[in-house]
Amino acid sequence: GPTNLAVSDNFKKRFESYGWEYVLINGHNKKEIFNALKKVQKAKKPTIISCKTKIGYGSPNKSGKSSSHGSPLGLDEIKLVRRNLNWNYKPFVIPKKILKEWRKIGKKGELLESKWNKIFKKKKNRINKILKNNFTKVLKKQKQISIKEINNLATRKSSELTLNALIKQNNTLIGGSADLAGSNNTKTKHHKITKPGDFNSNYIHYGVREHAMCGIMNGLSLHSNFIPYGGTFLIFSDYCKPSIRLAAMMKQRVIYVFTHDSIGLGEDGPTHQPIEQLTSLRSIPNLNVFRP
């Protein structure tokens, strides 16, 4: 059915309230698409291009109907769409002109990827060299401290002390928490908080946005040699699950600090008592789960 069955948002106002640039175009007009993409490349803030399109465009009998999305058009309707769009090529045939342009873009992308990989490898080698020189000593010392004081420390406090030692030696670790830094103990005295206009930092306050936090951590891991970690209560790992699953599929170095993992949690009550979460996390392929 129509989108107004479920949505009444004013998307323009929503994104403008975020401080974004909003560009509205006809999504079926290639000139408008080209001009919009050209414009946003010069933008000084995040931009969303809103492409106004019609579902099932070109289909004489299903254009503008939800049925064009949920079910096949059918062979007869496909023939009519081809005629309507003046598309005179056989199925799976790519016109030479289009193929030529695709190949050009492919070569351009290949060159950019090659340059990026060289820079990435250079930085990775430099960082690995730094880690090898310092990390073994730091970890050994911290292990001895943790073992010595284990009876007097909560696990999350022991985690904080370990992070405190690691952050001091490793500028690739990017910490954060979904509005629970004080409870998760993910923030140390060596952290500098990320603020608008100041990204020379290594700690992000994500707010009550567990899913966004884990999605951002995936991006940090994929883009550079960062090792992001983020904290929340184990019960809220369910909000993180889609992004955790993607990180595991992509074999990314993303670390999740899930505290308060006991059904013995008192004042917060049953809504904060994890029961099935640990089993669920352990069932995800490529995800290593450690429960000290």
Q: Which residues are covered by each model-predicted region?
A:
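Thiamine diphosphate
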Residues: 24, 100, 104-292
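Glycine-rich ThDP/TPP pyrophosphate-binding loop and its adjacent helix/strand module
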Residues: 1-104, 269, 277, 283-292
